[in-house]
């Protein structure tokens, strides 16, 4: 969970910040009053191109991390290495290049 939260904070930080402020401001009713902000985080994480790439490229280390957490519920610190591997993988994923940023290559002379 912590690894996923770190990735979410990196790429959907604005949404996460707004949700956190709402929860802090409405301690009695945050579940109801801040639900739409929670949904905006979900929308960001499901649609952000880099997060989609991370989910694909780093599925194996993330699954290993989740499995470690299940096996070590009472001692999640035992999973620090698994989390480090996932975050290391996530950091290596490059954002997709949009067609506008790809430089045109000259055609070879014939």
Swiss-Prot record:
GO terms for biological process: cellular respiration. A motif (Cx9C motif 2) lies at residues 34-44. The modification N-acetylmethionine is found at residue 1. A motif (Cx9C motif 4) lies at residues 79-89. Disulfide bonds join 12-44, 22-34, 58-89, 68-79. Keywords: Acetylation, Disulfide bond, Mitochondrion. It is found in: Mitochondrion intermembrane space. Its main location: mitochondrion. A motif (Cx9C motif 1) lies at residues 12-22. Monomer. This is Coiled-coil-helix-coiled-coil-helix domain-containing protein 5. It comes from Homo sapiens.
């Amino acid at each position: 969970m912590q690894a996923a939260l770190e990735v979410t904070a990196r790429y959907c930080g604005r949404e996460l910040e707004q949700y956190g402020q709402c929860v802090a401001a409405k301690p009695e009713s945050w579940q109801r009053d801040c639900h739409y902000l929670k949904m905006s985080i979900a929308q960001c994480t499901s649609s952000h191109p880099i997060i989609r790439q991370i989910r694909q490229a780093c599925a194996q280390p993330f699954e290993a991390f989740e499995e470690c957490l299940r096996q070590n519920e009472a001692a999640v610190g035992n999973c620090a290495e698994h989390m480090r591997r996932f975050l290391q993988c996530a950091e290596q994923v490059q954002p997709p290049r949009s067609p506008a940023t790809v430089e045109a290559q000259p055609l070879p002379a014939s």
